[in-house]
A protein has these predicted regions:
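Positively charged n-region of N-terminal signal peptides that target proteins for export
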Residues: 1-4, 8-11
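C-terminal motif of bacterial Sec signal peptides marking the signal peptidase cleavage site
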Residues: 15-19
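Soluble, non-membrane globular domain cores that form compact, hydrophobic packing
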Residues: 21-110, 116-189
Length: 189
């Protein structure tokens, strides 16, 4: 009887340890790749645990794109608004944008994703320079991170250290450190 119980317990242990093994994010074993700027932010936000989430709004302020508690599309027709709200230079070579912003204060957390139509490294530099030169009101964000995701997407995130770090942990966890190149990780002074 003891042998049977021991074998059953050993089998349960082996099965439970096997269940803890690594899993790919994609169901077919292939790495996950972004399909749009919005997809980047939605994929990251959807991996947050309930204890990590906070009140957010996404998209621009149009009726079609504004979203509560989720990322949203940011229409690029008004480039001055995209510059003011997200730090996207008006001359940047992008054809898609999406945003996810802390509902109480954008300086606490703002994330944006862009589909680059030009060089992602150049876009990352433009975004970094444009955001770092801002005059902040209602508090200064702690830090800025600009990351290239694959060959076509650039993500910016600025705000409180803990919120920015959590976002980057999820971004790297989804796309992998081989696909996410952190171009800039700087304190905002």
């Amino acid at each position: 009887m003891k042998k049977i119980v021991s074998l059953v317990l050993a089998a349960l242990l082996v099965l439970s340890l096997a269940a803890c093994g690594s899993k790919d994010n994609a169901s077919d074993g292939n790495p996950v790749w972004p399909t749009s700027a919005l997809n980047v932010l939605e994929t990251v936000w959807n991996t947050y645990g309930e204890d990590e989430k906070f009140a957010v709004a996404g998209g621009d302020f149009s009726e079609a794109n504004a979203r509560e508690d989720a990322p949203g599309v940011f229409d690029l027709k008004d480039r001055a608004l995209a510059d003011s709200e997200l730090g996207l230079p008006e001359t940047a070579e992008v054809d898609e944008a999406a945003s996810l912003v802390h509902m109480m204060n954008a300086n606490t957390f703002t994330a944006a994703a862009y589909h680059a139509t030009g060089d992602t490294a150049e876009l990352a530099q433009q975004l970094r320079d444009n955001i770092m030169q801002r005059q902040w009101m209602c508090g200064v964000p702690d830090k800025l991170i600009v990351a290239e995701v694959g060959d076509e997407y650039v993500v910016t995130v600025f705000g409180a250290d803990e919120l920015v770090d959590t976002f980057m942990t999820h971004l790297n966890g989804i796309y992998g450190v081989s696909a996410v190149h952190t171009a800039y990780d700087e304190a905002i002074l």
